[in-house]
């Protein structure tokens, strides 16, 4: 790490060329593949007994041949004729992308560490915007029900690869590395294979996930940072304390240009953008911007974000990707839940002297529901049930042992219960458990060539225990005769902090 710091020192002679030399350092590829650096066998050497797929010697030779223009500049139609690319094109692409992703992440990690510490006796700006997915849960529980309107935003996707390069250019002051990145993106990769916009999120090549996730996250960070800048300093559109934006190239030039446009048309209403109750939450490619303000205020934010993104990223942003919804009238799909705010009317009888009257108190209640139709669709796609939710057997698992079949069905059921434990109504989850349990029984009955009724009579209790969730197991063991109040605690909303994403239902082939 000392050598990494030496390359990243601002006053170093290699100030503008500090990342490119790291490409040829052997420990970079050990870090990229989580290999230990204290191995007796150095990855410097290429031999048949070691996986030399990420040897830096191969990468060095590859980069050298990349810059031999007479041998490398080819068209797509000639790729089959060129022995350098051929069938190894994806292999070379993965080698460079893994190493480059590991290298380019170094300045970001060091920047984060330095921002959280003191430098020369002065406190460096500490970002209060670093939040994990865990902060989403208290936001939904505590703040969501007190807001009025929400902007459902699909983050604009980069329409050109050069936008990704320009995004990194704000942070990486290294021309050689950026040229290598640009060359790699245009020669090795196809835009359609890198990023697809068929869904709200993005899908990446499985072989280069780390590299492409880094590019996407840096792009999303750029979108979010500009929004935070506008959110914190929207009244005068100028910041002197937001340290993360001070190093950007031409950033304030674009800001001043945008201010001139808005100053002419919105001299009176510009102060309305200052909203202390504005909240921003993102999950994958979908984000929400919730406020306690009015509909005109949210409409101004929509118009403002569209114009700013188009100006800052030099791309067309369709206004249909931002929808303004009232929380009390719409449900939204976020983090796999259907979230909504409902009004519960509570009637209270009040009496004053001899007169009595009823008072209607509307109370906002936040609800998170399990999307039953998409979930049954996923189960049907994995051949656990029909599209109508009727359980069916899974013939591809019939060759496994009984314990393996029960374990696989039980694991899927427990994973679903674990992920959707934050649901305010668990009735849907018990329906999913019924589908999986009966599908498991049909699969076992098919294997033993018997009926489901006969099989359930023979091993019904054992099959039931495998589908108990961890909470149900604890309650059944600790309180064998648990009262309904204890089981009611379990049926309430529970957020698990180890939830990041839901795994594929059929992760066994």
From Swiss-Prot:
Coiled coil: none annotated. Its main location: plastid. Keywords: Chloroplast, mRNA processing, Plastid, RNA-binding, tRNA processing. GO terms for biological process: mRNA processing; RNA splicing; tRNA processing. InterPro entries: Domain_X, Maturase_MatK, Maturase_MatK_N. It holds the Pfam family Intron_maturas2. GO terms for molecular function: RNA binding. It is found in: Plastid, Chloroplast. GO terms for cellular component: chloroplast. Usually encoded in the trnK tRNA gene intron. Probably assists in splicing its own and other chloroplast group II introns. Belongs to the intron maturase 2 family. MatK subfamily. This is Maturase K. It comes from Solanum bulbocastanum (Wild potato). The gene is matK.
């Amino acid at each position: 790490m000392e050598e990494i710091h030496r390359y990243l020192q601002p006053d170093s002679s290699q100030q503008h060329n500090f990342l490119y030399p790291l490409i040829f350092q052997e420990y970079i590829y050990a870090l990229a593949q989580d290999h230990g650096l204290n191995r007796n066998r150095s990855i410097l050497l290429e031999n048949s007994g070691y996986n030399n797929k990420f040897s830096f010697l191969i990468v060095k030779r590859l980069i050298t041949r990349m810059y031999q223009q007479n041998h490398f500049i080819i068209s797509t139609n000639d790729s089959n004729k060129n022995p350098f690319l051929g069938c190894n094109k994806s292999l070379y692409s993965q080698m460079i992308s893994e190493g480059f992703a590991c290298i380019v992440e170094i300045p970001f990690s060091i920047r984060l560490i330095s921002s959280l510490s003191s430098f020369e006796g002065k406190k460096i700006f500490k970002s209060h915007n670093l939040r994990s997915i865990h902060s989403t849960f208290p936001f939904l529980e505590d703040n969501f029900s007190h807001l009025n309107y929400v902007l459902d935003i699909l983050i604009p996707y980069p329409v050109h690869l050069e936008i990704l390069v320009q995004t990194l250019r704000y942070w990486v002051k290294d021309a050689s590395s950026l040229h290598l990145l640009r060359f790699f993106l245009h020669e090795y990769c196809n835009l359609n294979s890198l990023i697809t916009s068929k869904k709200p999120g993005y899908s990446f090549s499985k072989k280069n996930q780390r590299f492409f996730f880094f590019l996407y996250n840096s792009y999303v960070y750029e979108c979010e940072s500009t929004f935070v800048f506008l959110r914190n300093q929207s009244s005068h559109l100028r910041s002197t304390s937001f340290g993360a934006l001070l190093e950007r190239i031409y950033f304030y030039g674009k800001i001043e240009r945008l201010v001139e446009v808005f100053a002419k048309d919105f001299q009176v209403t510009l102060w309305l953008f200052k909203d202390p109750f504005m909240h921003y939450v993102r999950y994958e490619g979908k984000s929400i911007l919730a406020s306690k303000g009015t509909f005109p205020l949210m409409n101004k934010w929509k118009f403002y974000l569209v114009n700013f993104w188009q100006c800052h990223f030099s791309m067309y942003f369709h206004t249909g990707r931002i929808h303004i919804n009232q929380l009390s009238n719409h449900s939204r799909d976020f983090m796999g839940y259907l979230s909504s705010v409902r009004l519960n009317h509570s009637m209270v009888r009040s009496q004053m002297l001899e007169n009595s009257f009823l008072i209607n108190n509307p109370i906002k209640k936040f609800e998170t529901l399990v999307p039953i139709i998409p979930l049954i669709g996923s189960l049907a796609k994995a051949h656990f049930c029909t599209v109508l939710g009727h359980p069916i057997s899974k013939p591809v698992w019939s060759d496994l042992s009984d314990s393996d079949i029960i374990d696989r069905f039980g694991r899927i059921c427990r994973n679903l219960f674990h992920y959707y434990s934050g649901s305010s109504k668990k009735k849907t989850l018990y329906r999913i458990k019924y589908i999986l349990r009966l599908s498991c029984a049909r699969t076992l009955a098919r294997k033993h060539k018997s009926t489901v009724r006969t099989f359930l009579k023979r091993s019904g209790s054992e099959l039931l225990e495998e589908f108990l969730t961890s909470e149900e197991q604890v309650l059944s063991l600790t309180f064998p005769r648990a009262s309904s109040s204890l089981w009611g605690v379990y049926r309430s909303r529970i957020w698990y902090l180890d939830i990041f994403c839901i795994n594929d239902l059929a992760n066994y082939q």
